[in-house]
């Protein structure tokens, strides 16, 4: 293929001059061939500026790059290994192993830029996916082949919730999973690897990491690398779980290079192509008639503001949203899911059944009423409430505590063994509280337990 030379380097953005008749296409991968510390560095063409010059984003650090260095055009987009050989391995954005376990040796390599499945190939799913987490199964149930977002500010438990979901679903589901770590802490990636190893599900997970310390080009593309691997499993007729932690960093990486690529910033300094970049990724995460991709994405919410353009753009693509709240975390209730702010398209009597629907709505009604009464209680005290309202408050406080649950992955912090609660048990428990069957039990008994039977046992000890 044709060769060119570097004419300009600004951070992660590199301009390369090629002969006029051999200009690389947009998204072609270029490789540095000159000797030096950056030999073998891959860059992706983003723009053709004219005069044979193309503007690229470096997929690795641009330290040591110099003008005049020679670059070769590979003639195709970045290709990554796909298929069964990727399971149990940790790879980077280019699909190269970073776990020191030798080459991947996959039979097939796919380019990371692909078309989304056409309308006629897509399938709509209504089968529920049980997670074993009470608040999620009750209020915002997941669909098999659906998209879920875990929204939360810094430190409210997105990654811990994600780990628990992987632990519960990957074990019970016994399907294949792909984990894309996009711009998160290296330590979390390390913890995740050993967590999977200890629970013997490592041979069912492919891991792709582009951590916080990587250049923006790397973080911008690593989500596509993970998605491509998941698509291969789906097209083989399997049901895949795709975990992305964190989708906000994908947007952020786009923001970092956007200005360097010469684009005018839009609202809050985000890239003007925010919606399109998000759409390109999200439209590919879909289920077809051959197999399904169920995706669970952590979404960092900057400054706890859900109206920020990045989380707001993500909302549009999801079937279920699990919103984590700092106020609930402050009460010591974990998982800190806000039952009044979390939604699901599946919460429909035609999908989940009448009993589940009425229980979930009943729980939300009681909690909403309690929220309204809080102001009165703060000013006048509990004694000023009517008998009915006092009962609502008592039940709401029990429900709040019953929505908490000890996690398997958090045993080290809580000291209590994790609990998996079936959907049937969850509905039975909350229905009982709403019907007043447990009005005589103290509210402490409802905190950090699994099923309602454990509440009764705990109450005897209090």
Curated annotation (Swiss-Prot):
Which Gene Ontology MF annotations are present? ATP binding; ATP hydrolysis activity; proton-transporting ATP synthase activity, rotational mechanism
Q: Which domain of life is it from?
A: Bacteria
Keywords tagged on the record: ATP synthesis, ATP-binding, Cell inner membrane, Cell membrane, CF(1), Hydrogen ion transport, Ion transport, Membrane, Nucleotide-binding, Translocase, Transport
A Pfam family name for this chain? Answer: ATP-synt_VA_C
Among SUPFAM superfamilies, the record links this protein to:
C-terminal domain of alpha and beta subunits of F1 ATP synthase, N-terminal domain of alpha and beta subunits of F1 ATP synthase, P-loop containing nucleoside triphosphate hydrolases
Localization recorded for this chain is: Cell inner membrane
Q: How does it sit in the membrane?
A: Peripheral membrane protein
PANTHER family referenced in this protein's UniProt entry, alphabetically: ATP SYNTHASE, ATP SYNTHASE SUBUNIT BETA, MITOCHONDRIAL
Similarity comment text for this entry: Belongs to the ATPase alpha/beta chains family.
**Subunit arrangement?**
F-type ATPases have 2 components, CF(1) - the catalytic core - and CF(0) - the membrane proton channel. CF(1) has five subunits: alpha(3), beta(3), gamma(1), delta(1), epsilon(1). CF(0) has three main subunits: a(1), b(2) and c(9-12). The alpha and beta chains form an alternating ring which encloses part of the gamma chain. CF(1) is attached to CF(0) by a central stalk formed by the gamma and epsilon chains, while a peripheral stalk is formed by the delta and b chains.
Protein purpose? Produces ATP from ADP in the presence of a proton gradient across the membrane. The catalytic sites are hosted primarily by the beta subunits.
Q: What is this protein called?
A: ATP synthase subunit beta
Gene behind this chain?
atpD
